[in-house]
Amino acid sequence: MATIKEVKEQLAILRDLDDPRWASFEEDSRTGVQAAIRKRRKAILAELAEEERLETLLNYEKSLYARGIELIAGVDEVGRGPLAGPVVAAAVILPKLCKIKGLNDSKKIPKSKHEAIYNQVMKEAVAVGIGIKDNYVIDDVNIYEATKLAMIEAIEKLNPQPEHLLIDAMNLDLPIEQTSIIKGDANSLSIAAASIVAKVTRDKMMADYEQEFPGYAFAKNAGYGTKEHLSGIDKFGVTPIHRRSFEPIKSIIKK
């Protein structure tokens, strides 16, 4: 009789809930085997659900593939709302029908998985472009315009250049066919890829800023107006990376 460890190894091979081999395992009444069966079935169901989710996230891309368009760039930004730091945009072209497990709107991905999924996107992508506009540009032209400039910069860095843009809730003044998608990072795999690239890039920048400007917890809050961040402003004042057109920074520097 196979050991429970050996049974687990054999179960790991199964990918289909209708596989006839399940029957032989189910005849084994050992508690450990029955627990392993339940665990493997649950894992397969999760894998099937993930596959279905990724297929749904490719709906926009598949409609473009059907028209013969293959160089599709997803475009997204991170950092519109913080009181400090830049706005960062990313543009990502993935291979046709590419699926990256766990890829989603970066806000829905556990922080512990950000780096691994970012690395997978960077490995799989046909091209990646990143655009960064600092707080001085944001204060000069406003955050909406700075976001568009960052997106355009990211797209212009792509090589090859895309045939079509899928953009998260934005229209850009570029001679490239584009589709603006509300909540695009949750509805397009290409935009989700751009979302995680922008997120990880900006988080790394804010972690570096924490070393330069300790006391504001930038690595933890990414420049958002948390209690700890506001306490840092009260204690140490406004830094060179704070957005002076944003409240409460705007009022503080007027005092």
UniProtKB/Swiss-Prot annotation:
Swiss-Prot/TrEMBL catalytic activity: Endonucleolytic cleavage to 5'-phosphomonoester
Pfam family, one: RNase_HII
Aminoacyl-tRNA synthetase found in the keyword field: no
EC main group: hydrolase
A GO term for molecular function: RNA binding
Function, as annotated: Endonuclease that specifically degrades the RNA of RNA-DNA hybrids.
Official protein name in the record: Ribonuclease HII
Organism: Streptococcus thermophilus (strain ATCC BAA-491 / LMD-9)
